[in-house]
Design a protein with these regions (language model features):
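Nucleic-acid endonuclease domains
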Residues: 1-79, 87-507
Length: 507
């Protein structure tokens, strides 16, 4: 690789200008046009075209477009310019729009080394202070990775407001390491900066930790979370300038407190207030028959007018969703919590865990699934109300993320569900009653699948129709049968097991 570099390696803008020439090209184009390849293009193509391996494309650009050897040290890729190259996929969402295809891995965490407590002296900062983001579209119809199109190339500096949150995230992670609790780290601990598991099978890639010789921990890396990178993708790379979302907290507030603390401060002052009193205090005139009545009240309690979580800047970046948990009066338990309706055709098309891989060759089919996006990539702000004779009283809130061990149980249930759908859902008909073999609440203790439709209706491939609804109440199965529209639900008992005791109504 002795060819002269077609960019100034000391100038970030020069590197960016050269990178922008990639836009519209495929990775095969890069290989075909490379001035650095000393071997036959066919030989090089074979290394990167495995349809299961979604990684390696960043290495291809490093070597055959930018002309430098791949490095894995803590220095930036373009060290003379202080620029880190990050090549990553984006995908189309099932419901339209686009999302980051993966979290953005920054650097491995070495649990055996002394921890750097100053974020600005850490390897993480070296890897993220100035990044050249190159995004390609992961088109599921394309089988050869080299045929993916590169669509975006842009320098990115993390905004100062976000840095306050990231520094707090860093502190949360290193505090656990210093306490000898690296084995207890979870991505759910933090907002924007995560500590994701690494290794072909994370459960087998256990490493020792300096601060606790008795317990091994899963190998992990610092990363920018999928929810954060999805926001960067949509509001920065895909937009001429950053799209404004509703602001939850000011930069000054975030310098003094974490998002979690600000949420608690804003909501806790309403504890033991009746919902009517809260609405009156906030000047709200909302029809109580509105199914989103409490959710609207909670948003105003938080100081935002947006009902949609993804339109609140910090909630969008941290993947926070507000959910109202209501304990019924007269000794009735709170309800199961609906997460999202299921599209069975899309679920069937989702790859199994070992059918998709990241840059390092790790299985990520599960992490690319819709159910993981709902439960693994999100935090939930539970706003708890207790019903009484006069309506409902606010009892407090809890910011929650599903523990890693529970996500593993959900992963196993997701795999079983996909197998059932692929083999054909089994139905048992008894008059107008139709039962199926989809996930039951007793099977994993966390979630289940059950109907979410106004009316029940089934239409089977033999022409049989059962129920008092119509086609609009159904979803199509890969077999051709139509089933009453189904949804993922969190079990009521599981929600109770995760809530703080002061929020639970004991009977």
């Amino acid at each position: 690789m002795t060819a002269k570099l077609p960019y100034d390696k000391t100038d970030p803008k020069s590197i960016e200008r050269y990178a922008k020439k990639l836009i519209g090209k495929t990775f095969q184009d890069v290989l075909n046009e490379s001035i650095y390849s000393n071997s036959k293009v066919g030989d090089e193509s074979g290394k990167y075209c495995d349809e299961k391996r979604k990684g390696g494309l960043g290495n291809l650009l490093e070597k055959y477009y930018f002309g430098y050897e791949v490095n894995s040290d803590s220095e930036p890729d373009f060290k003379e310019a202080g620029v880190e190259l990050k090549v990553s996929p984006y995908e189309e969402k099932n419901k339209g729009g686009y999302k980051a295809g993966e979290r953005l891995v920054l650097t491995m965490i070495n649990f055996n080394k002394e921890v750097e407590q100053d974020f600005y002296k850490s390897h993480v900062w070296e890897k993220c202070k100035l990044m050249l983001l190159i995004y390609y579209f992961r088109d599921k119809a394309i089988k050869n990775n080299l045929d993916y199109h590169i669509d975006y190339a842009k320098l990115f500096e993390i905004p100062e407001k976000d840095m306050n949150i990231i520094i707090n995230d860093y502190k949360i992670i290193i505090d656990k390491i210093l306490q000898g609790k690296a084995h207890e780290i979870s991505e759910g601990d933090t907002m924007y900066l995560g500590a994701c598991t690494k290794g072909a099978t994370a459960a087998k890639s256990l490493v020792s930790q300096r601060y606790n010789e008795n317990v091994k921990a899963k190998s992990r890396a610092f990363c920018l979370k999928n929810s954060y990178m999805t926001t960067v993708l949509n509001n920065y790379l895909m937009a001429d300038e950053c799209t404004d979302a509703a602001e939850f907290a000011s930069e000054k507030e975030l310098e003094a407190k974490s998002i979690s603390e600000i949420i608690q401060d804003r909501l806790n002052k309403y504890i033991n207030w009746n919902e009517d009193r809260i609405a009156s205090k906030l000047g709200l005139d909302i029809n109580k028959k509105n199914k989103s009545y409490e959710a609207i009240i909670v948003k105003h309690m938080l100081g935002v007018n947006e009902l949609e979580d993804e339109k609140i800047d910090e909630f969008q970046k941290a993947g926070i969703n507000v959910k109202v948990v209501k304990f019924k009066k007269h000794g009735k338990p709170n309800e199961n919590m609906r997460l999202e309706d299921i599209n069975f055709i899309n679920l069937d098309k989702e790859p199994f865990d070992d059918e998709i891989k990241d840059e390092e060759g790790n299985d990520i089919g599960w992490e690319a699934s819709r159910l993981y996006e709902i439960l693994g990539n999100r935090k939930y702000l539970f706003a708890v109300f207790w019903e009484d004779e006069e309506g409902a009283t606010f009892k407090g809130c809890q910011l929650w993320a599903m523990p890693d061990d529970d996500l593993e149980k959900v992963k196993a249930a997701w795999k079983e569900l996909k197998i059932k759908i692929r083999n054909g859902v089994e139905f048992e008909v008894n008059g107008n009653i139709v039962t199926n073999n989809l996930t039951k609440s007793s099977e994993n203790g966390i979630f289940h699948v059950r109907p979410h439709a106004k009316n029940s209706f089934y239409k089977f491939t033999d022409g049989t129709e059962i129920g008092n609804g119509n086609i609009s109440d159904t979803d199509l199965l890969p077999s051709g049968d139509r089933i009453t529209r189904q949804a993922y639900w969190l079990n009521q008992s599981y929600i109770n097991s995760q809530l703080e005791d002061t929020l639970i109504r004991h009977h």
